[in-house]
Structures are given as structure tokens and as C-alpha cells.
Regions:
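N-terminal membrane-targeting hydrophobic helices
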Residues: 1-146
Length: 146
């Protein structure tokens, strides 16, 4: 997915689930982290492309960070822990979103899985993002009514 759609989809999901602007901001930072650490394609596009969606898109990495934090390395409720938690959540949502437009690592960093519902940058990608936003709004509205 394009970064703008990662930001929108992740931000809407987290805000819909938490109603918290700070958690949303941290998750939106996490939503671009897996791509940001891989750098830009540059002149060696195919070399970059071969490495894209590698270790930085491995969900086990972010789940392990969350688990380590639960062991008490950071004080419970600390702002740093909260920020790191939502950055990891944003990265995990990024990986899930990428699984709809290609393949991402799952249990092993070199074993990729996913479905290709759309091509990155296509109209279908933007329609998918819009559908997630609308679905999140409907779910949020239903929960708020009860």
C-alpha cells in the first residue's frame, strides 16, 4: 500500500478502537516504520525490491517487542511504553494491510504469505482504504450506541 493509505487506515482503526489522539499519532508513526527502515529504492530498484517486505515486515519482531515490554522492562503505564506499544501496533497493522496487496513474512522472515486483492497505487487500493474507513466507522457507531 501507499504510505498515505497506511496512515489513513491505521489511524482510523486505532482512533476508532481507542478514541485517543496520542495513541493514533503513535500508531500512524508505526504505520510507516516497516517501509521507512528499508529506505528508498533509488537507482538499484530491483535490488531494493528483492529485499522489500523482509525482516522489517516480520510480525514476530513487533510481537516480541510487545511481549518484552509486558515483562516489565518499562514501567507499566509509562509514556514511553505506551508510545512503543502503539508504534508496534501501527507496524503490525501496516503488515496486515500489506498482506492484502502482496506477500509478507509470517512465522519465518523468509516465508511470505498474503493475497493480492489489488496492486499498490491502483484505484482498488484507494477503494479498499475507503471501505476500511467506512467499516470502522460503522463498527464504532454500533459500539457507541450500545
Amino acid at each position: 500500500m501507499k504510505w498515505v493509505n497506511h496512515e489513513i487506515v491505521t489511524g482510523v482503526i486505532v482512533y476508532g478502537a481507542t478514541g485517543d489522539f496520542l495513541a493514533t499519532a503513535f500508531s500512524m508513526a508505526g504505520a510507516i516504520f516497516p517501509d521507512k527502515v528499508e529506505g528508498k529504492p533509488g537507482a538499484n530498484y530491483w535490488s531494493w525490491r528483492a529485499r522489500h517486505r523482509g525482516w522489517s515486515h516480520w510480525p514476530v519482531l513487533y510481537i516480541a517487542i510487545l511481549a518484552i515490554m509486558q515483562l516489565g522492562l518499562l514501567p507499566q503505564g509509562a509514556d514511553v511504553e505506551r508510545g512503543a506499544t502503539f508504534i508496534c501496533i501501527g507496524a503490525l497493522l501496516h503488515i496486515a494491510e500489506d498482506a492484502f496487496c502482496g506477500k509478507v513474512p509470517l512465522f519465518l522472515p523468509w516465508q511470505k504469505v498474503g493475497i493480492k486483492l489489488f496492486t499498490v497505487g491502483s484505484v482498488m487500493e484507494y477503494l479498499f482504504a475507503m471501505a476500511v474507513v467506512i467499516l470502522t466507522y460503522i463498527i464504532h457507531a454500533q459500539v457507541m450506541v450500545k
